[in-house]
A protein has these predicted regions:
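Alpha-helical transition-metal enzyme core signature, strongest for iron centers
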Residues: 13-20, 43-58, 95-105, 138-152
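Short alpha-helical transmembrane interface motifs in multi-pass membrane proteins
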Residues: 134-136
Length: 180
């Protein structure tokens, strides 16, 4: 028995996506083109990457239920996902994409059972490690989003925006201090 199954994956992913959406809403649309360095993704590009990049795991587990990645056509999938990421979007469209895609992914996660999550997927011949469980691979979607959300929070600071989670913490501290 797993203590962390499909329902828990879905709920934790929804929490992560809710926080990503808060950042997407807090950053003004005229700053979506901001990039900290020329060779980095802009705010809009990071948000698009977050919204689209789970397409890799979706293809492997939800659409094709592959048990091996040997022979998988990575270049074709990456080309398609890259084209989707590079589609120009307004702030409203980006928030809609993050919302719609996030909820569709979470609903799929909710239906996963322990047997499915425990299945092993063999990596390509040069893959390290040579095999991973579906649970590990699917969990990486949330980990990947949190990685990029950390970048977005630093960008918020560069833009003079206090991240929403920091604002909440400051409000709690201020309320606690006011009671003393």
């Amino acid at each position: 028995m797993n203590y962390y199954g499909g329902k828990e994956l879905a709920e934790s992913f929804r929490t992560v996506r809710k926080n990503t959406l808060a950042i997407a809403q807090d950053i003004p649309e005229d700053k979506y083109d901001f990039r900290p360095m020329p060779e980095t993704r802009s705010v809009g590009e990071l948000l698009a990457h977050i919204a689209i990049s789970n397409g890799f795991q979706k293809k492997i587990h939800a659409e094709e239920r592959l048990n091996t990645l040997a022979g998988f056509d990575f270049p074709s999938l990456m080309k398609r996902l890259s084209a989707e990421e590079n589609t120009p979007r307004t702030k409203v469209q980006m928030i809609e994409l993050l919302t719609k895609d996030g909820e569709a992914w979470a609903k799929w996660l909710e239906g996963l059972d322990d047997n499915f999550l425990g299945e092993v997927v063999t990596m390509p011949p040069t893959g390290t490690p040579p095999a991973r469980t579906r649970f590990d691979m699917i969990l990486s979607v949330k980990e990947h989003e949190m990685h990029h959300r950390g970048q977005l929070m630093l960008i918020e600071r560069m833009l003079g925006i206090v991240p929403h989670l920091t604002r909440r913490m400051q409000e709690r501290f201020a309320a606690s201090a006011a009671k003393k």
